[in-house]
A protein has these predicted regions:
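Interfacial segments at transmembrane-helix termini and the short loops linking adjacent helices
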Residues: 73, 138-168, 174, 214
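Membrane-interface junctions at transmembrane-helix termini in multi-pass inner-membrane proteins
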Residues: 1-2, 164-195, 235-239
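Hydrophobic alpha-helical transmembrane segments
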Residues: 1-25, 45, 195-199, 213-234
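Small-residue-rich midsections of specific transmembrane alpha-helices
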Residues: 18, 53-62, 80-103, 127-128, ...
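Interfacial transmembrane-helix starts/ends
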Residues: 43, 80, 104, 112-141, ...
Length: 250
């Protein structure tokens, strides 16, 4: 275990060094200690974005915590393994959103609604295709995948399927979060996140005592589906655009 942790830390440090050297090769940083204008607004925006962006991760941690209150602790480990398997689906989405961040900010600043809508739709279609492929690979090979880990962790097939569906819905949203974070409506993401948290806790209290880890997965799936639907509807109302079209299902 200690060797594994050292290797993981080493990989992250190596990645940081490589990225730092590449960035320095393009342009060396210049340190200046000037007075920052509108510092309070910048700090407020940064704090809200950090909190709102952490909601999805916090939700999965809430699930694990609440499971420990209702079921044996070993079943929480089964749930954790299933969650990590399903989370692979959104890895391409996280990478693409970092790329889309400056483009989205540019189009919003220029009020270029045509380009923004095109980016919204294309990002949704691209991520849905990639996420859908990973989803199929996971679902079709889940039994073989569980054979590679200890048998005691092989529970949670339903959890993998439900959380994978929720993550696939995240992919279908395209750059929805990026649009909200870079617009004047970034505050509402935090409000939606609070609603999601309350909904998740309430559903977990109902489903976990009845269905165990499968109940927690059901609660998470319902909460994320409601959360994503609200955000899609909000962007539709404020920007008059949807992430998917008739061609999405083809």
């Amino acid at each position: 275990v200690e060797t594994f942790i050292v290797c993981v830390v080493g990989v992250y440090v190596l990645r940081m060094v490589v990225m730092m050297l590449y960035a320095f090769s393009i342009r060396l940083p210049v340190f200046k200690f000037n007075k920052i204008e509108r510092l309070s607004s910048i700090l407020k925006y940064s704090l809200l974005i950090i909190i709102a962006g952490s909601i999805a991760t916090i939700i999965l941690d809430i699930d694990s915590f609440m499971l420990g209150l209702y079921i044996p602790i070993e079943e929480v480990a089964y749930y954790g393994v299933a969650i990590y398997i399903a989370t692979v689906i959104v890895v391409p989405s996280r990478a693409m959103q970092q790329i889309l961040q400056p483009l989205t900010a540019q189009y919003l600043n220029e009020k270029n609604k045509v380009a923004l809508k095109d980016l919204y739709v294309r990002s949704s279609q691209t991520l849905f295709i990639i996420g859908g492929l990973i989803f199929l690979l996971i679902v079709l090979n889940i039994n073989s995948l569980y054979e590679t880990i200890p048998p005691q962790f092989s529970g949670g097939l339903i959890v993998v399927f439900l959380i994978s569906m929720a993550k696939l819905y995240d992919c279908l949203m395209g750059c929805n979060n990026v649009v909200l974070f870079n617009s004047d409506y970034y505050r509402v993401v935090l409000i939606f996140g609070v609603i999601l948290t309350i909904l998740t806790i309430g559903l977990n209290m109902i489903f976990i005592p009845r269905y165990g880890i499968n109940g927690s997965a059901q609660a998470t799936f319902i909460a994320i589906a409601v959360y994503n639907t609200i955000k899609i509807y909000f962007v539709k109302r404020k920007f008059d655009m949807m992430p998917f079209t008739i061609d999405t299902g083809k």
